[in-house]
């Protein structure tokens, strides 16, 4: 830590005059610390307005794919990361279109079958970074007179956004990053339905941390690290807790069904 904040600044900003001035970091770098992602073997996935997937690496394994950003971590290593531009912002647009609250939306998603009866959505409403399609727009494929339902459209947008994360996770795995489980954070992680979908599509166990605001927790842990000099790993062991009730395992039949739907997604992306 550099020291404590100047009294005049503390008064002007209305913050604790004992607040320390120390190194900081970006939201994903802090999210990594806040999920204990400070050593190889852990992958963090955030389901927010945008979606991110990242993992600690000891070396800068630069991917040939431009979609993978090889950031520095805030814990002394590297943080290969992918970021999609359309996640809960895309699902939110569909909710607003049908005037659904979150519970009603989730009920419709659950009502539809895996693969949304052939309906595929490329939810690139803001363009997209992963896949790298900055000028793309959103689109629907596979519509028929019988499958054009609210339930299928609701499921298609959730599946489509999650397939984007799978696309990015595959890019990270190609660089050698592996994990026995995915630590899920962000607003979408609160949905048991979405947790199961992530586990099935990624074919990996999913767990959440007890503190859902992982970036804020990470910033606090980093400040404690800078102030105390205690090893970061020790602080993470003390402060980062996994929520055992959130543990979600992939279901074999679902994994197979989602793989077929994901291949369809890949085929649609390849035409853009």
Where are these regions (language model features)?
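Active-site core segments that coordinate phosphate-bearing ligands/cofactors
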Residues: 3-185, 190-272
């Amino acid at each position: 830590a550099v020291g404590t904040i100047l009294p005049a600044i503390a008064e002007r900003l209305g913050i604790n005059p004992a607040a320390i001035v120390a190194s900081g970091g970006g939201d994903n770098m802090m999210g990594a610390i806040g999920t204990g992602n400070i050593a190889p073997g852990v992958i963090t996935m955030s389901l927010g307005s945008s979606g991110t997937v990242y993992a600690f690496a000891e070396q800068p394994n630069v991917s040939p794919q431009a979609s993978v950003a090889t950031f520095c971590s805030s814990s002394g290593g590297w943080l290969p990361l992918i970021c999609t531009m359309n996640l809960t912002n895309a699902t939110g647009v569909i909710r607003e279109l049908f005037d659904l609250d979150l519970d009603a939306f989730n009920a419709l998603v659950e009502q539809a079958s895996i693969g949304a009866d052939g309906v595929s959505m490329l939810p690139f409403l803001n363009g997209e970074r992963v896949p790298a399609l900055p000028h793309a727009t959103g689109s629907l494929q596979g519509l028929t007179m019988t499958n054009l339902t609210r339930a299928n459209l609701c499921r298609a947008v959730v599946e489509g956004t999650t397939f984007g994360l799978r696309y990015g996770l595959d890019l990270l795995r190609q660089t050698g990053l592996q994990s026995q489980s995915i630590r899920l954070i962000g607003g979408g992680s609160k949905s048991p339905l979405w947790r199961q979908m992530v586990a099935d599509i990624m074919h990996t166990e999913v767990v959440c941390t007890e503190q859902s605001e992982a970036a804020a927790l990470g910033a606090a842990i980093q400040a404690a690290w800078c102030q105390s000099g205690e090893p970061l790993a020790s602080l993470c062991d003390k402060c980062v807790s996994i929520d055992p009730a959130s543990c979600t395992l992939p279901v074999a039949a679902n994994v197979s069904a989602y793989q077929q739907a994901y291949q369809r997604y890949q085929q649609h992306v390849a035409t853009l």
